[in-house]
Amino acid sequence: MKRIFILLNMLLQKNGWGRADYLRKNNILGHIGKNVSYRPYNLPQEAKLLHLGDNVWIAAGVRFVTHDMINHMLYFLGEKEFDPPILHVGEIHIGNNVVIGSDSIILYG
């Protein structure tokens, strides 16, 4: 329920600067620096694992993926030499002075 409330509030923000301010004021991300524009309307599943530096511009449609389940897929293909299904989770750190273009997918690691 809390996640839906956050996403609705992000939709109500006028622009990327407003969304970044909302994320910063409500301590939703792990870290968000100064002068950040966050244009996507979505958040990673584990938002606290996303860290944004100063002077960051994130275009619309960008997705941050903080987890993967490749072992899950391979295990059920009959390749039993892989470990049983495990959810792998990791942090994403975006440094200072970064621009991320539209519809990019950023993975952890």
Regions found by a protein language model. Name each.
Residues 1-29, 34, 62, 67-72:
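Terminal amphipathic alpha-helical/low-complexity segments used for targeting or macromolecular assembly
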Residues 19, 38-109:
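Flexible, glycine/small-residue-enriched loop-and-beta-strand segment within the central core
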